[in-house]
């Protein structure tokens, strides 16, 4: 099947299509993950983006569905050097080609992904259009140029839950005095493994939509407010920002990735768009308090401005060891903390899982 990838700067790359026949538009981003394509494609944080893998062969072990981070593919399309035609794994039920086809998502292979990655690092991420069933480069470039910027898109509404949902903590798992604690989780596109990590520690959860007002959250009588990961520009998550403002100082507040940015904004800091973002499972972060290095899984295109933290009560807890951007903050006096990386991994290393989720349990009075 014919396929073409067009970028807003006029770059045209022709290749071979796989998956569904059709068109995908979005911001072209790259990840350095070697594996974990099931998790990445189903991560709601990739909504509005075309995902490109730098690793040259993707799909080797097929698709099982056991590690999906949501029910569906959220990336708009897939760009790879080569898609494996004959995957093998005893749990595999279909190929990556069939997975994309079933989900109505296009893919393109035969692409020099390293060249595109270097271009993104030098010039920044760009809007792109991926067309399968056609190799009309001019059409692809026009579509890319006319597609909205990520800052203009309303992505959160496309991934948040529609109704509140209660998830009881795992029976007998809460290690603390009294009954299990209850966290209200603002769902901005939460990954399944974040839910799993809170659940397996015995914490009762109420997932609420992104537009939930502070007074509605208060009605659930939470012991903690938790802000999830999600796609797009954090400044658009105004309801979540207002929720943090309302509960900061009254109950513990924690967040991951997008949630980290929202907490920082709510406390008075600023965020900015990175040139090409951090995406992959090999990102080193330094704990400035413990003087330790961890390898983390990351997926974000925005970061918190370190200089803007002055006067907010927040301090930098974690720093990216590569580019020195903020990877986590804590409050000097209040139980407010967040990380930019993904301690729950899926995919990626588990170096920081217990560090982060153990702290969640601790501030709730558990871990005794």
From Swiss-Prot:
Location of region: CPSase: 1-178
EC number(s) stated in the UniProt entry for this protein: 6.3.5.5
Keyword annotations of the record: Amino-acid biosynthesis, Arginine biosynthesis, ATP-binding, Glutamine amidotransferase, Ligase, Nucleotide-binding, Pyrimidine biosynthesis
Residues reported to bind L-glutamine: 45, 230, 232, 258, 261, 299, 301-302
SMART domains named in the record: CPSase_sm_chain (SM01097)
Domain Glutamine amidotransferase type-1, residue spans: 182-368
SUPFAM superfamilies assigned to the protein according to its UniProt record, in alphabetical order: Carbamoyl phosphate synthetase, small subunit N-terminal domain (SSF52021), Class I glutamine amidotransferase-like (SSF52317)
GO biological process entries: 'de novo' pyrimidine nucleobase biosynthetic process; 'de novo' UMP biosynthetic process; glutamine metabolic process; L-arginine biosynthetic process
Single annotated GO MF: carbamoyl-phosphate synthase (glutamine-hydrolyzing) activity
UniProt xrefs under InterPro entries: Anth_synth/Amidotransfase, CarbamoylP_synth_ssu, CarbamoylP_synth_ssu_N, CarbP_synth_ssu_N_sf, Class_I_gatase-like, CPSase_GATase1, GATASE
Catalytic activity: hydrogencarbonate + L-glutamine + 2 ATP + H2O = carbamoyl phosphate + L-glutamate + 2 ADP + phosphate + 2 H(+)
Pathway: Amino-acid biosynthesis; L-arginine biosynthesis; carbamoyl phosphate from bicarbonate: step 1/1; Pyrimidine metabolism; UMP biosynthesis via de novo pathway; (S)-dihydroorotate from bicarbonate: step 1/3
Cell inner membrane keyword on record: no
Positions of the catalytic residues: 257, 342, 344
Record function comment: Small subunit of the glutamine-dependent carbamoyl phosphate synthetase (CPSase). CPSase catalyzes the formation of carbamoyl phosphate from the ammonia moiety of glutamine, carbonate, and phosphate donated by ATP, constituting the first step of 2 biosynthetic pathways, one leading to arginine and/or urea and the other to pyrimidine nucleotides. The small subunit (glutamine amidotransferase) binds and cleaves glutamine to supply the large subunit with the substrate ammonia.
Quaternary structure, from the entry: Composed of two chains; the small (or glutamine) chain promotes the hydrolysis of glutamine to ammonia, which is used by the large (or ammonia) chain to synthesize carbamoyl phosphate. Tetramer of heterodimers (alpha,beta)4.
Similarity comment text for this entry: Belongs to the CarA family.
Annotated protein name in UniProt: Carbamoyl phosphate synthase small chain
Organism, scientific name: Methanosarcina mazei (strain ATCC BAA-159 / DSM 3647 / Goe1 / Go1 / JCM 11833 / OCM 88) (Methanosarcina frisia)
Designated gene of the protein: carA
